[in-house]
């Protein structure tokens, strides 16, 4: 019964293309939610006893310590379903009562439709004019990794491509994909140094998380390699400011930074490009124009367009 419920929840998340499943302990029960775009949807309630068994099942298949219920843990696995597997990442932490919360990130590696205000992916490919650093920014689950891999397939299909990720989210047969493992010294910094010895035409670095990663990404870009990476920021200008906070100098940014693509998921609207202009000249008006176009085309409701415009003004 436990496995049947677990499979049902993962299958539902996959079918709905949810980014995350949340298992949250409340006062008298557990509640399960899923996130699709910016919307968090209630799924179902479970008794404590049932959900404790379900969480233990997920922890076991992900190689986590089933007996540890208070300290935070991370895990990942390919979860088997009837028609294949779903790659998932897990994060747990216990509350003050000893009940665990669980978040499952579903890694969708299938090809997704990307709708842009310009003429689709080939047009964006033309903007990859020179070697250096290209950054993809936006909220969690907005499709940054999907876009990076789509561009890699479109622009570097017959070239040497390597990726460094934590974990590998989209499996590609035509690139060498490396996965972080701090326990055996496979850190971002060490793997970037190793990757440069392979002389890749494109190096995909999953995420700029801290000063160490930021410095390593800049060093890789300075060698003349084309580098793709993601970063969390609230705007294109916010990307620039975030890099400065992480210790990257303005002079280094002027040398290596070739472009920034900001994106976020709009309910009903697909993945929409925010800006491909020079990061120092970006204006939020471009985003507002796109919101108007999406509403006029019927992809999103007018109220949603107005709400998104308010966010970015």
What is each model feature region?
Residues 1-313:
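Short, flexible helix-loop junctions that flank or precede catalytic/ligand sites
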């Amino acid at each position: 019964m436990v496995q049947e419920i677990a499979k049902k929840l993962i299958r539902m998340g996959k079918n709905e293309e949810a980014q995350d499943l949340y298992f949250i302990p409340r006062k008298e029960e557990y509640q399960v939610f899923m996130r699709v775009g910016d919307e968090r949807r209630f799924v179902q309630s479970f008794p404590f006893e049932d959900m404790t068994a379900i969480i233990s099942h997920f922890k076991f298949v992900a190689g986590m310590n089933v007996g540890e219920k208070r300290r935070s843990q991370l895990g990942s696995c390919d979860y088997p379903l009837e028609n294949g597997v779903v790659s998932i990442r897990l994060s747990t932490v216990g509350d003050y009562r000893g009940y665990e919360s669980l978040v499952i990130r579903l890694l969708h590696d299938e090809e997704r439709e990307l709708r842009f205000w310009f003429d689709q992916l080939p047009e964006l490919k033309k903007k990859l004019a020179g070697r250096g650093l290209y950054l993809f920014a936006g909220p969690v689950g907005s499709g940054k990794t999907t876009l990076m891999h789509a561009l890699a397939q479109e622009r570097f299909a017959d070239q040497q491509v390597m990726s460094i990720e934590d974990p590998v989210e989209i499996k590609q047969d035509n690139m060498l994909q490396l996965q972080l493992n701090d326990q055996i010294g496979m850190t971002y910094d060490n793997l970037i140094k190793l990757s440069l010895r392979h002389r890749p035409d494109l190096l995909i670095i999953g995420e700029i998380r801290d000063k160490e990663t930021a410095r390593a990404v800049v060093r890789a870009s300075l060698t003349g390699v084309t580098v793709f990476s993601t970063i969390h920021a609230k705007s294109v200008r916010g990307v620039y400011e975030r890099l400065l906070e992480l210790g990257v100098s303005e002079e280094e940014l002027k040398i290596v930074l070739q472009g920034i693509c900001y994106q976020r998921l709009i309910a009903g609207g697909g993945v929409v490009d925010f800006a491909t202009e020079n990061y120092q000249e970006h204006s939020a008006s471009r985003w507002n124009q796109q919101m108007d176009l999406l509403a006029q085309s019927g992809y999103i409701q007018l109220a949603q367009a107005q709400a998104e415009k308010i966010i970015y003004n």
